[in-house]
UniProtKB/Swiss-Prot annotation:
The keyword Mitochondrion does not apply. This is Outer membrane usher protein PefC. It is found in: Cell outer membrane. GO terms for cellular component: cell outer membrane. Belongs to the fimbrial export usher family. Involved in the export and assembly of FimA fimbrial subunits across the outer membrane. One of its GO terms (molecular function) is fimbrial usher porin activity.
Length: 802
């Protein structure tokens, strides 16, 4: 009998029977007198048969979480032993995240399988009625959802992720720009390069390749190894491009709940208790802990604001503790390590040009490390080069209700070709404070650089003059939430060693919602630099009003703007997205200088490509422009494919020969059954078939896969499928009496199903049988012909014994 991905309606007798089996004690004896016309009692109905032999398609449930579906074959030996022996391959394919080293004592050496239920703390239960296999496994015996043992590096693949646009203005030449990311996957390695091409209105053009890296993930050090041209990464020094090798940590490799900063929550539970953590009125964590001390180090990343920890014990008594939290980017979790080691030759520009020949002569070495203690984070970094040396340290301290503060200092020494030497230092300080759930001083920063301080990113031994070398800089950012309103303020001031005067600037933005959905936005900016005669400023006010037209939600927008150039403008428009593929808009612009324009845009996402077109009519010219984006992807299995998906980590899924089925909301499968889905790297992704468009005559061996892809991987999964012939038959004797009970077989001896009490037989066959036999209780056999019976009608059809 083949497997089912659809659930058929059971007869009232079947429902009652399975309900009884589900709630009855395993020691109770089921009265089988109601079964008539059967020569044998199925094992599923016998008392004590927890694992009746047979072929099943079950939901796999681990610790109350459904992890997917799987084929399950129970042998007569397992039925007799009343225990399942599961192979490592089956457990992995079914998505059971178990550490088998903890079950060494349950290994059946002859069958190379594990009888997990022999462990006193583990249960494996099979439910025939719900067709599910339920595991109860101690937490210490489980593999984490994103454990490196579950990482999938993908299949060999090549892809080109692209975006391009072009425009044509009347009376001018066409201008165009294209950007592409080329990636080649081979084993655990990924070769990646970014490139762009431009064509300007004057007819000139340019092609640029920016970088090229060969990288691989290394789980043992929770980081990436990169070879080629890339960028450094450090919390203390400015980043710069280089040719060489780097080994650096990757926080995305951590479980989702361990990414970003969160304080360590500790306490003592008097009894089995539930610990709930909330922030800004929302629960962000909840866990049941046993009596005694507890330590919660898996609270997912939080922002600024008080954490309210509520402990509810077995009697219902609650105690509450408040943890004031303010974060800074350099603040790490307790025990978290961040590192970066790079060696190579500094590049002089952003282009991939003359590798190991451009840039600063000589090799450099850079190393940085950060470590998180309970409430303190230490960072240190160093750069060594024949003509440049620098070192730096910083301390970031969480102050609880007083916020968080960071202080750091760098020293540098530079030697120039003309014999000059520069020595200097840089000091910095940052402070952040959350005053309430709605008010944050996001950042108050100060940085001072002495006259001789030089960043390696700005160092060139042939040029000792650093233009506009910053002396000091102050910076402030503040945010305030007031009901439906958000206010953001930012300001900065800096001065320079080689120039008199100061540069100042600031931004303000206010957004609010009024009158049941009307959005209002107010923005303003100001800047004044010593090398410009006049300040630069601008302000704008805009409204967005939703309305429904023809059953489609539209948005009408109106805006006013004014800038320091003395230009005042007004714009008005309407936009809508009727479907997830289609969006459109119409806009008009006016200015006090007499300029005016009318433009319309249309975007549509095809299965293979995302497109956009725009037509603009000005007072003196007409402009037509368009853009496209997508990915061209090739694997050995799928061949060449085009998709509008542009993620860095992708999955290629296939249902062989089945067209028009979506997977994870993807574009429909093509004529060969392939489609492409976006995936999140180092996270548990469930790749599931959307069942709405699956043909009725198709049976899937599985409907979902769990994958944990590495960054930039192309993962391949195939959903086994069979086209089946479904028959719903009511079997009757020659005189018209309903035949109750009995197992049916085809002329080839294949199992064709079991006749229910109302004479209904559900047959699911891979090929059309011509004749079916049913053994009666007295030993006689009923034969009936299936010739002329049409499969897959969804209707009950009657057949008669011959």
């Amino acid at each position: 009998m083949s497997f089912h991905h659809r659930v058929f309606k059971l007869s009232a007798l079947s429902l009652a029977l399975f309900s009884h089996l589900s709630f009855a004690s395993t020691d109770s004896e089921l009265n089988l007198d109601f079964l008539q016309g059967m020569s044998a009692i199925p094992s599923v109905l016998k008392s004590g048969s927890d694992f009746p032999a047979g072929q099943y398609y079950v939901d796999v449930i681990v610790n109350q979480e459904n992890v997917g579906k799987a084929r399950l074959s129970i042998t007569p030996q397992e039925e007799s032993a009343n225990a399942l022996c599961l192979s490592p391959e089956w457990l992995k394919a079914a998505g059971v995240p178990v550490r088998l080293e903890g079950y060494a004592s349950t290994l059946n050496a002859a069958g190379q399988c594990y009888v997990l239920s022999r462990n006193p703390y583990t249960r494996v239960d099979f439910s025939y009625g719900s067709q599910s296999l339920v595991f109860s496994i101690p937490q210490s015996f489980l593999v984490g959802k994103t454990d490196p043992s579950r990482w999938d590096y993908g299949v060999p693949a090549a892809r080109l992720k692209y975006s391009a646009n072009a425009s044509q203005t009347s009376g001018q030449s066409t201008s165009a720009y294209a950007n592409a990311d080329l990636m080649v996957n081979l084993g655990r390695w990924v070769l990646a390069s970014n490139m762009s091409a431009s064509r300007y209105a004057d007819g000139s053009g340019e092609f640029t390749a920016r970088d090229i890296t060969l990288s691989t993930a290394i789980s043992q050090v929770q980081g990436d190894l990169l070879l080629g041209k890339s960028q450094t990464r450090s919390a203390l020094f400015s980043d710069f491009g280089f040719y060489g090798a780097a080994l650096r940590s990757n926080s995305n490799m951590l479980p989702w709940e361990a990414r970003g900063y969160a304080p360590l929550i500790t306490g003592v539970a008097n009894s089995t208790s539930r610990v709930t953590i909330s922030q800004n009125g929302y629960a962000v964590y909840s866990k049941v802990v046993p009596p005694g001390p507890y330590q919660l180090d898996d609270v997912r990343s939080v922002g600024n604001g008080d954490l309210v920890v509520t402990v509810e014990d077995a009697s219902g008594h609650k105690t509450t503790t408040v943890y004031p939290v303010t974060t800074l980017p350099t603040l790490l979790r307790p025990g978290e390590v961040e590192y970066n080691v790079a060696v190579g030759r500094k590049s002089s520009n952003y282009k991939l040009k003359k590798p190991f020949a451009d840039g600063e002569n000589g090799m450099f070495w850079m190393g940085s490390v950060g470590y998180g203690f309970d409430s303190t984070t230490l960072n240190a970094a160093s750069i060594l080069h024949g003509k440049y040396q620098a070192g730096g340290v910083s301390v970031t301290q969480a102050l609880g209700g007083f916020g968080a503060v960071s202080a750091g200092m760098n020293l540098s020494q530079a030697k120039y070709d003309n014999g000059d030497n520069k020595r200097g230092h840089s000091v910095s300080a940052k402070y952040a404070k959350s005053f309430s759930d709605s008010s944050d001083l996001q950042l108050l920063a100060y940085r001072y650089q002495s006259k001789g301080y030089v960043e390696f990113a700005d160092f060139y031994s042939t040029d000792r003059y650093t233009r506009y070398n910053t002396k000091s800089r102050y910076e402030m950012r503040f945010s305030q939430r007031l009901g439906n309103s958000n206010l953001n303020l930012a300001g900065w001031q800096e001065d320079y060693w080689w120039m008199k005067g100061k540069a100042i600037g600031g931004d303000v933005s206010l957004s609010t919602t009024i009158l049941d959905g009307v959005s209002v936005f107010l923005n303003g900016s100001y800047s004044k630099r010593p090398y410009l005669d006049k300040p630069d400023y601008s302000t704008s006010l805009s409204f967005s009003i939703p309305f429904t037209l023809g059953g489609v939600r539209h948005y009408s927008s109106t805006g006013l703007s004014y800038s320091s150039s003395g230009r005042m403008g007004m714009n008005s428009g309407v936009s809508a997205s009727p479907t997830d593929r289609l969006s459109y808009g119409l806009n008009t612009n006016l200015s006090d200088k007499g300029d005016r324009s009318l433009s319309g845009n249309l975007s549509y996402g095809f299965d293979a490509i995302q497109t956009n077109m725009m037509l603009s009519q000005g007072r003196d010219n007409t402009t037509v422009s368009g853009s496209v984006s997508g990915t061209i992807l090739g694997t050995a299995d799928s061949g060449l494919m085009m998709t509008k998906e542009t993620g860095n980590t992708l999955g290629v899924a296939r249902i062989p020969g089945v067209k028009g089925v979506r997977i994870n909301g993807s574009a429909p499968t093509n004529s060969k059954g392939y489609t492409v889905v976006n995936l999140s790297d180092y996270s548990l992704n469930r790749v599931s078939v959307d069942m709405e468009n699956v043909p009725d005559d198709l049976e899937l061996q599985t409907t979902s896969f769990n994958v944990v892809p590495t960054e930039k991987a192309v993962v391949y999964r195939e959903f086994g499928a069979e086209h089946v012939l479904r028959y719903i038959l009511r079997v009757k004797e020659r005189d018209g009496r309903i035949l109750n009970g009995g197992s049916a077989q085809t002329e080839q001896g294949l199992d064709a199903g079991f006749i229910a009490g109302n004479g209904v037989l559900l047959m699911n066959m891979l090929s059309a049988p011509s004749r079916v036999s049913v053994e009666r209780g007295d030993g006689s056999v009923c034969h009936f012909s299936v010739k002329g019976i049409v499969p897959n009608t969804g209707k009950v059809q009657e057949v008669y014994c011959e």
